[in-house]
Amino acid sequence: MTQISGSPDVPDLGRRQFMNLLTFGTITGVAAGALYPAVKYLIPPSSGGSGGGVTAKDALGNDVKVTEFLASHNAGDRVLAQGLKGDPTYIVVQGDDTIANYGINAVCTHLGCVVPWNASENKFMCPCHGSQYNAEGKVVRGPAPLSLALAHATVTDDDKLVLSTWTETDFRTDEDPWWA
């Protein structure tokens, strides 16, 4: 039986070569699927996108509206909200009933516990290992090695609070921010 070959430009792919190619493709696909989560874990998350920040969310997941927020909180309060990367961030109410231009990340720099505000002692006190931070989040007692991270807090024209990455000098330590 005579077989008529197609174009001489088309390479002949034998059964063995086809099976090798199919096996290689299958193994590569499975390996890539297995490695994807590991590689994604090693790449740090973005800090809220390039849009200039994220809108702070209250405990119920609603956008923080500044006038309503100030009506229900007193001067000196530090109130948890969802901030950059979804981290808990304290919104600071100043003495003149305005919101401070900074937010304080509530994640302890020792082992990552959420640090509650202790109003009676006017400081943040970590329940895990006893680290303490002053009212601005500067570490005053270890074992935490660093102060709490800061975020810019800005009120938008539509009365929402936007938190963005703090990249300037840390006003508490006069050093470059360790978190940027």
Curated annotation (Swiss-Prot):
SUPFAM superfamilies: ISP domain. Its cofactor is [2Fe-2S] cluster. Its EC number is 7.1.1.6. One of its GO terms (biological process) is photosynthesis. Keywords: 2Fe-2S, Disulfide bond, Electron transport, Iron, Iron-sulfur, Membrane, Metal-binding, Thylakoid, Translocase, Transmembrane, Transmembrane helix, Transport. It is an enzyme of class 7 (translocase). GO terms for cellular component: plasma membrane; plasma membrane-derived thylakoid membrane. The chain crosses the membrane at residues 21-43. It holds the Pfam family Rieske. Gene3D superfamilies: Rieske [2Fe-2S] iron-sulphur domain, Single helix bin. InterPro entries: cNMP-bd_dom, Cyt_b6_f_Rieske, Rieske_2Fe-2S, Rieske_2Fe-2S_sf, Rieske_Fe-S_prot, Rieske_Fe-S_prot_C. [2Fe-2S] cluster binds at residues 108, 110, 126, 129. It is found in: Cellular thylakoid membrane. Disulfide bonds join 113-128. Residues 66-162 form the Rieske domain. CDD domains: Rieske_cytochrome_b6f (cd03471). Its main location: membrane. Binds 1 [2Fe-2S] cluster per subunit. It is a single-pass membrane protein. The 4 large subunits of the cytochrome b6-f complex are cytochrome b6, subunit IV (17 kDa polypeptide, PetD), cytochrome f and the Rieske protein, while the 4 small subunits are PetG, PetL, PetM and PetN. The complex functions as a dimer. NCBIfam families: Cytb6fFeSPetC (NF045928), PRK13474.1 (NF010001). The Rieske iron-sulfur protein is a high potential 2Fe-2S protein. Component of the cytochrome b6-f complex, which mediates electron transfer between photosystem II (PSII) and photosystem I (PSI), cyclic electron flow around PSI, and state transitions. Belongs to the Rieske iron-sulfur protein family. This is Cytochrome b6-f complex iron-sulfur subunit 2. The gene is petC2.
